[in-house]
């Protein structure tokens, strides 16, 4: 009888050890750099999740402010939180570091100035599990940080399951699906088995998210706004600079290169052309604005022509697809500022 009781206690102990040592279901990757006023709210929203089987990887991108001091409070009080420190390399490098350190079945990215609803992980996880989907996606809300007021203009989606081709087409063309790294849950193997990393550039999400969807069997969509995107400053158009202008079209070239290497360009050529047209128009506005702000119109006509050359070059497909990042032989140049008199 005693041996039976002993065996029973041993089984309980073994199960407990297995539960304590097994990998978490979800790895949350939070890049951190200069977000001291916002990080506590972000981490509190993670700590308050109804889904508890996660690890929160806080990637310190050599943040010079007090962000990590705040993060250390969470690490000290909750074993699910940990900090990984790296030399400053930007958002993409921080995300890539987080992926390298992750062990969960799924990966979620949360920007450290944003925050999430309490059921964010639970609903995205259930959407994947119940539909046997490699990825899930939810709506999001712009949160105006200026006065702490939620903007009523939400990016709402309907509950559905998108099959592979529809999801890829929609995320490339920015039609019904946005290419942000956040507001999604990914099977970790999408990144690890296909060696997907974020390139060091602006619009790295645009250049990467279609790849993740391409390798997903399908995409489960949760029809609720569960992610809060904090708008801290001006709109994307008002903060465009020459590097962003060039990277905007280059992000499409990266996806075009990827599709051509995988023999799928023809399947999504319409979507590539649609997003090229959209970005080309955005760049026309941005180029003119750059020259107005510089009080110099010298070179503006040349820059506008270059914008069209870039778009045409990407679409002509006369360049050879490469295993790494492709080369775009054209670039818009910064206007030379005139001194105000």
What are the language-model segments listed below?
Residues 44-53:
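Short, acidic, metal-binding catalytic loop of nucleotide-sugar glycosyltransferases
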């Amino acid at each position: 009888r005693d041996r039976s009781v002993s065996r029973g206690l041993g089984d309980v102990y073994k199960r407990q050890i297995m539960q304590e040592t097994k990998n978490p279901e979800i790895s949350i990757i939070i890049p951190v750099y200069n977000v001291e006023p916002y990080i506590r709210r972000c981490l509190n929203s993670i700590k308050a999740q109804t889904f508890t089987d996660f690890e929160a990887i806080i990637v310190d991108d050599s943040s010079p402010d007090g962000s990590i001091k705040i993060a250390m409070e969470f690490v000290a009080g909750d074993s699910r939180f940990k900090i990984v420190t790296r030399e400053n390399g930007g958002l993409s490098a921080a995300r890539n570091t987080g992926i390298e350190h992750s062990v969960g079945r799924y990966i979620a990215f949360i920007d450290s100035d944003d925050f999430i609803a309490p059921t964010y992980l639970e609903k995205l996880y259930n959407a994947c599990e119940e539909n046997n989907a490699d990825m899930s996606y939810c709506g999001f809300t712009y949160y105006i940080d200026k006065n702490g007021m939620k903007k009523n203009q939400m990016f709402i989606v309907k509950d559905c399951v998108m099959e592979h081709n529809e999801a890829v087409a929609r995320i490339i063309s920015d039609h019904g699906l946005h290419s942000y790294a956040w507001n999604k849950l990914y099977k970790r193997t999408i990144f690890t088995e296909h060696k997907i990393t974020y390139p060091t550039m602006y619009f790295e999400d645009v250049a990467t998210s279609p790849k993740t969807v391409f390798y997903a069997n399908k995409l489960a969509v949760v029809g609720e706004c569960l992610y809060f995107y904090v708008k801290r400053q001006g709109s994307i158009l008002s903060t465009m600079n020459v590097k962003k202008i060039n990277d905007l079209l280059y992000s499409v070239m990266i996806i075009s290169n990827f599709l051509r290497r995988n023999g799928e360009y023809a399947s999504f050529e319409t979507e590539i052309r649609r997003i090229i047209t959209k970005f080309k128009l955005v760049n026309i506005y941005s180029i003119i604005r750059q020259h107005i702000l510089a009080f110099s119109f010298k070179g503006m006509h040349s820059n506008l022509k270059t914008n069209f050359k870039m778009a045409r070059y990407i679409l002509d497909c006369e360049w050879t697809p490469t295993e790494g990042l492709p080369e775009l032989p054209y670039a818009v140049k910064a206007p030379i500022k005139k001194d105000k008199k």
